[in-house]
Structures are given as C-alpha cells and as structure tokens.
Amino acid sequence: LKNGTTYNSFIIRGEKTALVDTSHEKFRQQYMDTLTGEIDPKDIDYLIISHTEPDHSGLVKDVLALAPQAIVVGAKVAIQFLENLIHQPFERLVVKNGDKLDLGNGHVIEFVSAPNLHWPDTIFSYDSKTQVLFTCDAFGMHYCSDSTYDDDLAAIEEDYHFYYECLMGPNARSVLSAMKRMAELGEIGTVATGHGPLLRYNVVGLTGR
C-alpha cells in the first residue's frame, strides 16, 4: 500500500447515539483511546456493524466491554458471525433492506442490504438528516493523507480504481444491485467509506464508474 490506508469508524449523534464500525485489533489501543476521547462509551446506544471482516469488527468485544448497554445492529448473517467471534451474550437488532432506526433529532438510519461487497453480511447505513451513506468497503480506497474528504481527485483516482478492480470488480453484479437500492434513498451528499477519504466532492463521478 504505497499511500497507506485508514480504518474509518463513525459516531452519529441524535437523541440516541450510534457507533458505526470499529477497527482492527492490531490498532486496539489507538482506536480505544480515540473513541473514549470523543465519547463516553456508556452513551453509545447502538453499535452498527457494516460487516464482520476483522478490520471493521475486530474491536466489537472491546467496545462492548465499555458499553455493555449498546445494541449491536447488523444483518442476520453478521449477528450469527459475531456470536462465533466474541463468544459472549450481547443485545442485538437484526436489520434487513429498507429497515429504519430512529435515533431522534431527525437522524433516521435506513439500512441497505449489500451482500458480497465484499463480505456476505454487508449492509450500508443512510442517515437521512445529514445525507451521509456509510458504505463500509464499497467505494473506498487504500489511501491516507491529511484530508478527510476527496478534495484532490487527481491524487486519489489511481488508488480508487485499483481498489475497485481488486475488491469490488469481481462482484460487479453485487455492486449494481447495491446501487439500485441506493437509488431508492434520498439524496446522497457524502459517502462515508471504511477506508480512505470520504467522498463529498466527487460522489456522482466516483460512485457512477
């Protein structure tokens, strides 16, 4: 990875709070320090798991140790996988395509089933208030810089296409199916991916390719 990568995790704050994804266990200390610097884990109401690949779910057990009240949200298969990964009881909410979770203050999260992108249990999460679509690995890239967003298209374009061809291209039919479901959502202002900068300035150009 000549330009590095990032492991992205997100906090959605409404009347209730959701944490979207965790990180890889090899970054345990850095992640947990960052998370607890941003929020008291006792305030996390929901832990949304986009899929159970280790770089997104590797610290679920650690988060639940500090936030035992959190309800884990995921596809049916994801919840089943997690049971075998963390070996402990946990509160859960199984969601399917079109299901919604109201966090309050206008933050209604709608879930999009996106299997095989590139894990069998993948879901996207769409926040209708902020128009942010959390897509896990889809539309991501292995690229790391000081920029949070895709404000330098020329710098990221090569890595974006390479990532797509390696991870998403083999599942092109699944990509098209997910995009059809995405089209049923409201306007998408930002694509918050699991790796690399978030797409804000080139959403149409990059997700349409």
Where are these regions (language model features)?
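Conserved beta-strand hairpin/beta-sheet module of binuclear metal-dependent hydrolase folds
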Residues: L1-G37, F124-D127, Q131-T135
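Active-site metal-binding motif and surrounding structural segment of the metallo-beta-lactamase
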Residues: E15, K26-V73
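Active-site neighborhood of phospho(di)ester-bond hydrolases with catalytic His/Asp-centered motifs
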Residues: V20-T22, I44-T52, V72-A75, L133-C136, ...
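Short, glycine/acidic-enriched loop or turn micro-motifs at the edges of active sites
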Residues: H24-E25, P54, G140, L198
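Metallo-beta-lactamase
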Residues: G74-Y201
